[in-house]
Each structure stands twice: as structure tokens, then as C-alpha cells.
Amino acid sequence: MVRAWYMDDSDADQRAPHMTDPPQPVELDQLKNIGVLYWQLSGNEDDETLAGIRKDRGYSYNDLIEITPEKLPNYEQKIKTFFEEHLHLDEEIRYCVGGSGYFDVRDKGDKWIRIEMEKGDLIVLPAGIYHRFTLDEKNYIKAMRLFVGEPVWTPYNRPADDKDARKEYLKTMGLAA
């Protein structure tokens, strides 16, 4: 089951949990309130529930990515890119089939929430939400990336408030100017 919490302000290793003291857990309904969707699945690539979700949501393309120094070309550069705060014009859909890592997302007050991803976790980040990704201290994740149609993974680093996806996200969240 996914765990999420508000992050501390430490500049220590990005792969550390970064929990506040005392911890401030974030519940699934709080994630849903900022547009983040979550499912707990088996962790198998051929999960039947995943097949149903893919059909219902139109996820017609998928691939697998292994993020580890031994398997990912240009590892150091990729890790820096993933951890740069950004948004996408489409949903970001990830299903963890091995290992673990963290997605950090901004809440409505612009505070960081850290979402721990482990085997079996399926997460959907809405288009226009500022976020970033990092491995945890185990330095390994294997994830299925899902897309509607042809894969597009174009990050727009913050600030990207001029993008229509960001404006629509803010409007949906009741935060439009």
C-alpha cells in the first residue's frame, strides 16, 4: 500500500525519505484532491486489473524502464533530469513492477508531498501538476510506463505556468487566477 507524507526542507541526499519530525502522513483522499490517482496491484506485468484500467483509461502503449546505474544509459544525467521540478502536458502513468522510488508532487499550497512507490503501486499524475522523481536509497526501480497513444515524455521545467495543461490543472483544482 502506498505511503505518502509531507517532506522536510533538508538539502540532504534526495534519495532519503525526508519525513518531517514529527511525520505528517498524507492519505489517499488527499492525493486524490490534487488529482493524483492510485491503485494497488500485484506487481506483475500481466496483472488483470491493470488490463482493465488500461482499457478504461485508453492506455494503449507501454514499455518498461529499469533505473539503476548498471542498466540506464547516461544514468547520472537522467537522474538529474527526473529530479528537476517539471510538468507534462499529458498524464504521467507509472506502474512499479520491481524496486522502489519516490514521486514528489506539489500540494495546493505549493508544499512537497513525497509518494513512496513500491512493487504493485500504480500511480497517475495529472497533466499540469509540478512533480519530480528520484530513486530511494536502494538505487533501483523497474517501472512500466503507460501512455495514451504514442509515447510522449516531454518535461517542462518550472516555471511552466504558461502551458495550457498547467492552466487547466489550476482551474480544476480551484486555483486559477
Swiss-Prot record:
Q: InterPro entries recorded for this chain?
A: ARD (IPR004313), ARD_euk (IPR027496), RmlC-like_jellyroll (IPR014710), RmlC_Cupin_sf (IPR011051)
According to its UniProt entry, one GO biological process term is: L-methionine salvage from methylthioadenosine
Provide the species name: Branchiostoma floridae (Florida lancelet)
Q: Which cofactor does it need?
A: Fe(2+); Ni(2+)
Q: What is this protein called?
A: Acireductone dioxygenase
Annotated keywords: Amino-acid biosynthesis, Cytoplasm, Dioxygenase, Iron, Metal-binding, Methionine biosynthesis, Nickel, Nucleus, Oxidoreductase
EC number(s) given by UniProt: 1.13.11.54, 1.13.11.53
Q: Which residues bind Fe(2+)?
A: 86, 88, 92, 131
For this protein's source organism, the top of the classification is: Eukaryota, Metazoa, Chordata, Cephalochordata, Leptocardii
* The UniProt record lists the keyword RNA-binding: no
Question: Which purpose does this protein serve, as stated in its record?
Answer: Catalyzes 2 different reactions between oxygen and the acireductone 1,2-dihydroxy-3-keto-5-methylthiopentene (DHK-MTPene) depending upon the metal bound in the active site. Fe-containing acireductone dioxygenase (Fe-ARD) produces formate and 2-keto-4-methylthiobutyrate (KMTB), the alpha-ketoacid precursor of methionine in the methionine recycle pathway. Ni-containing acireductone dioxygenase (Ni-ARD) produces methylthiopropionate, carbon monoxide and formate, and does not lie on the methionine recycle pathway.
Give the pathway: Amino-acid biosynthesis; L-methionine biosynthesis via salvage pathway; L-methionine from S-methyl-5-thio-alpha-D-ribose 1-phosphate: step 5/6
